[in-house]
């Protein structure tokens, strides 16, 4: 492959979805992260909060319940895991 195709692949890899949320459950090498998004109704302009839970791969078991983390989309690791832990942004006790 030439350098141009490698650069294009790297660019598409960087376009993967990244989310931030709170860890609500842990188990070996897996965490469940709850991500909250806010949106506005198109017609009535009322604001809503939507919560979604993602099973996330945590290879080194770095995250604990209550931590604020950053996760990124990746290849399917199992039937329900399609995200991986990028970093722990804030520990539970820190402000």
UniProtKB/Swiss-Prot annotation:
InterPro entries for the chain: NA-bd_OB-fold, Ribosomal_uS17, Ribosomal_uS17_bact/chlr, Ribosomal_uS17_CS
GO cellular component, one term: cytosolic small ribosomal subunit
Record flagged with keyword Nucleotide-binding: no
Coiled coil: none
SUPFAM superfamilies given in the database record: Nucleic acid-binding proteins
Classification via Pfam families: Ribosomal_S17 (PF00366)
Keywords for this protein: Ribonucleoprotein, Ribosomal protein, RNA-binding, rRNA-binding
Molecular function GO labels: rRNA binding; structural constituent of ribosome
Biological process, per Gene Ontology: translation
Superkingdom: Bacteria
Role description: One of the primary rRNA binding proteins, it binds specifically to the 5'-end of 16S ribosomal RNA.
PANTHER family named among the record's database cross-references: 40S RIBOSOMAL PROTEIN S11 FAMILY MEMBER, SMALL RIBOSOMAL SUBUNIT PROTEIN US17M
Subunit note: Part of the 30S ribosomal subunit.
NCBIfam families: PRK05610.1, uS17_bact
Family: Belongs to the universal ribosomal protein uS17 family.
Protein name, entry field: Small ribosomal subunit protein uS17
Species annotation: Mesomycoplasma hyopneumoniae (strain 7448) (Mycoplasma hyopneumoniae)
């Amino acid at each position: 492959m030439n350098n141009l195709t490698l650069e294009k692949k790297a660019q598409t890899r960087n376009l993967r979805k990244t989310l931030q949320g709170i860890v609500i459950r842990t188990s070996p090498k897996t965490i469940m992260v709850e991500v909250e998004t806010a949106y506005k109704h198109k017609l009535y302009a009322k604001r809503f909060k939507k919560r979604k839970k993602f099973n996330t791969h945590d290879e080194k078991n770095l995250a604990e319940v209550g931590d604020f983390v950053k996760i990124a989309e990746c290849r399917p690791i199992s039937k329900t895991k399609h995200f991986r832990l990028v970093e722990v942004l804030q520990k539970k006790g820190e402000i």
